[in-house]
Amino acid sequence: MLERDREQMSVFVAHVDGGSHGSPGPSGIGVVLQDSEGEKIRISKWIGHQDNNVAEYAALLEALQHALRLKAKVLRVFSDSQVVVRQMTGEYACRSPRLYSLHWTCRKLARSLEFSIFHIEREHNSEANQLAHHAVRSRSFRV
């Protein structure tokens, strides 16, 4: 395998979503992680009783951790959470004590990659959203 091919295989795209039924309330995350070949890993995970922003950060953290386990070099993340996207890009400061440790951990992991994060409308994040809602309904973990 050529080095260029190996580098292409280490490029991942993630769609992430966190959801809470009530805020705080029963919460779950959904992550769709896709490699450069188009293969997808879908993660649906119950995270207990949280608020929506904690759930959104938990979804991003799961994507970062999974991408690093897969030896990703590049990770492009798409999220419908303006708070998470704007805090991760530095447009907003993270002043919330309940979000700060998640934000800090995500920033630290993101520095290990060529990382970018983009805001998308909710209707363009439906697969991750369905996985998050499934986790809340079933209170389970699935990869």
Which functions belong to the PLM regions below?
Residues 1-3, 44-47, 85-88:
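A generic short-segment signal for beta-strand/edge and adjacent turn/coil regions
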Residues 7, 33-41, 58, 79-83, ...:
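Short amphipathic alpha-helical segments, especially helix-boundary/capping motifs
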Residues 19-23, 61-141:
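RNase H catalytic domain
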Residues 5-54, 65-69, 73:
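RNase H-like nuclease fold core
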Residues 49-56, 95-99:
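Active-site beta-loop-alpha junctions of metal-dependent nucleic acid enzymes
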Residues 1-6, 100:
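N-terminal intrinsically disordered, compositionally biased regulatory/targeting segments
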